[in-house]
Amino acid sequence: MTQRRAYRWPQPLAGQQARIWYGGDYNPDQWPEEVWDDDVRLMKKAGVNLVSVGIFSWAKIETSEGVYDFDWLDRIINKLGEAGIAVDLASATASPPMWLTQAHPEVLWKDYRGDVCQPGARQHWRPTSPVFREYALKLCRAMAEHYKGNPYVVAWHVSNEYGCHNRFDYSED
């Protein structure tokens, strides 16, 4: 793999001309790996040249505290990149894993009645939680270190849909 320069905006993959980015979210971790080739083929047929990957993947990337599995993500990023589809890599912090919410229930947000939002959906974390931020930062650092030189990762985005489900947190802090 060749080293890429840092740019403010995503740059085309090596050998491609600049053009408008066209694509969307892709969640390969929610499907059997056997369908990935067909997914990529259909994306190419539709003219897709950029996809966001990893948005809700924290539990699959960090399978337990401090234990990271990037193998599946490496495979799909390479598969996409080799097909000429660039990757906007998400921080995977949109949905914390069950091991985190069980060990640290204080990361869960409360509604106006004081009821705690239970895990099982997305954005069940509270933005004011220092514990959540600490674990999210560890994940982001591990991902950045692992993917810093990957030529197929042309952009990064942190979390997803800020304020969508957890905008009204009535926790004490």
What are these language model-derived features?
Residues 82-88, 96-173:
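Active-site region of glycoside hydrolase catalytic domains
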Residues 3-35, 40-50:
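An acidic-aromatic substrate-binding cleft motif
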Residues 37-117, 141-144:
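Aromatic-lined substrate-binding rim segments of carbohydrate-active enzymes
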Residues 20-24, 51-53, 87-91, 154-158:
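Hydrophobic faces of well-ordered beta-strands that scaffold small-molecule active sites
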Residues 1-13, 65-68, 80, 160-163:
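Short, charged N-terminal helix-start/capping segments
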Residues 21-33, 54-73, 116-137, 144-146, ...:
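The substrate-binding groove and active-site-proximal loops of carbohydrate-active enzymes
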